[in-house]
Amino acid sequence: MSLSNSLGLLGRKVGMMRLFTDDGDAVPVTVVDVSNNRVTQVKTQENDGYVALQVTFGSRKASRVTKPEAGHLAKAGVEAGEIIREFRVTAETAGKYATGAAVPVADVFSVGQKVDVQGTSIGKGYAGTIKRHNMASQRASHGNSRSHNVPGSIGMAQDPGRVFPGKRMTGHLGDATTTTQNLDVIRVDEARQLLLIKGAIPGSKGGFVTVRPAVKAKASQGAN
């Protein structure tokens, strides 16, 4: 499924827990709160040049909303949310929703479906090459003096006499937009509007995430 026709949901990472199968196996899952997703704008081919649904999640004080955004939301008749995202969809999908309509989780996801989850990874601060790029440490002894966790040589010979751009070195790690692909939906809680996804997803507790139908789901299933 391509991004051009996949409606997703915005949510907040609640935390992790585990579920038990009928066989007694423990399955680690991440709980995502996807309640209160509502449409702020329906974009059409005639008016905007492409078809999409603009969705907001959560709630925010009116004093925290910029004037342009406040006018946009007032026109839609929608309460201000904490984040706004846009999903490219088909004209058929866009026709199912009107401005201000709620998007329940059962409309988008089902148990066993593959999803991609995008969020902001946990910031780790300044990190070395071992942690940042998964490089191997050097020898602990046997002639190694104070060079255990250094990257080693970073340069070339006299020609070209410089470090090439893109060389993996130390630097800031984390706090970046990250996507984890092909995760399984284990449970859909319609009553509480919760999505239980197998495994870990990017970000810390309370962080915002975007959940979409998996882009590479068909390719991965066909490979098996």
UniProtKB/Swiss-Prot annotation:
Which positions bear N5-methylglutamine? 158
Q: How is it modified after translation?
A: Methylated by PrmB.
Gene Ontology annotations for the cellular component aspect, listed alphabetically:
cytosolic large ribosomal subunit
Mention any Pfam family matching this sequence.
Answer: Ribosomal_L3
Q: Which PROSITE patterns match?
A: RIBOSOMAL_L3 (PS00474)
Source domain of life: Bacteria
Which GO biological process categories is it annotated with? translation
Q: Which UniProt keywords apply?
A: Methylation, Ribonucleoprotein, Ribosomal protein, RNA-binding, rRNA-binding
User: What does the record give under GO molecular function?
Assistant: rRNA binding; structural constituent of ribosome
Family label = Belongs to the universal ribosomal protein uL3 family.
* Summary of the function given for this chain in its UniProt record: One of the primary rRNA binding proteins, it binds directly near the 3'-end of the 23S rRNA, where it nucleates assembly of the 50S subunit.
Q: How does it associate, per the subunit comment? A: Part of the 50S ribosomal subunit. Forms a cluster with proteins L14 and L19.
What is this protein's name?
A: Large ribosomal subunit protein uL3
